Design a protein with these regions (language model features):
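Bacterial N-terminal signal peptides that target proteins for export
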Residues: 6-23
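Sec/Tat signal peptide C-region and signal peptidase I cleavage site
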Residues: 33-37
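Hydrophobic face of amphipathic alpha-helices that form TPR/SEL1-like repeat modules
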Residues: 39-46, 58-62, 73-80, 109-116, ...
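TPR/TPR-like alpha-solenoid signature
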Residues: 40, 72, 93, 108, ...
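Short helix-capping/linker turns of helical repeat alpha-solenoids
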Residues: 50-51, 64-67, 80-82, 87, ...
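Terminal, low-structured helical/coil segments at or just beyond the last alpha-helical repeat
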Residues: 141-165
């Protein structure tokens, strides 16, 4: 009987300790998410106002920490020369990071870069692969773009793209 009381006491203490840890972890996550949202919102507000230098300053740390939305937005800035000198290779870098995390718009832009040879060697196989992935991720334009591209590809290239996708 004494063992059961001791076990109940230990269990309550362990549960209490676990709840405290979970509460602290939740607070940490919420505070980080709040800080992310504030920084991202500052960048978005700046971008909408045409202040792309500030947008870059707000989004770059988020992008470097792995945020796919910020990575995509940095890709757009470099792709279009907004707040930075236009740099297609840098745009491809950021699109690739976001695309690998499933960001359909980044996948679509990356496919376009491969199709046109912007920032990368022109490669219809990789353009096909990325438009295929973007279509699977929900991009409405990707399938149409891929269908247009297929008309310019050999049967061997189409087969290779399908095998690699």
């Amino acid at each position: 009987m004494g063992v059961l009381i001791w076990f109940r006491h230990i269990s309550k203490a362990a549960i209490s300790h676990t709840i405290k840890k979970l509460t602290l972890a939740t607070l940490l996550i919420v505070s980080c998410a709040t800080a992310w949202a504030a920084d991202f919102a500052k960048g978005l507000t700046a971008s909408r106002a045409g202040d792309f230098v500030t947008a870059l300053a707000e989004w770059k740390p988020l992008a470097e920490q792995g945020d796919a939305i910020a990575q995509f937005d940095l890709g757009l800035l470099y792709d279009n020369g907004k707040g930075v000198i236009e740099d297609d290779k840098e745009a491809v870098k950021w699109y690739m990071l976001a695309a690998e995390q499933g960001k359909a718009s980044a996948q679509t832009n990356l496919a376009f870069m491969h199709a046109t040879g912007q920032g990368v060697i022109q490669d219809n196989v990789y353009a096909h692969i990325w438009w295929n992935i973007a279509a699977a991720s929900g991009s409405e334009n990707a399938k149409g773009n891929k269908d247009i591209l297929v008309k310019q590809m050999t049967a061997q290239d189409i087969s290779k793209a399908q095998d690699l996708a």
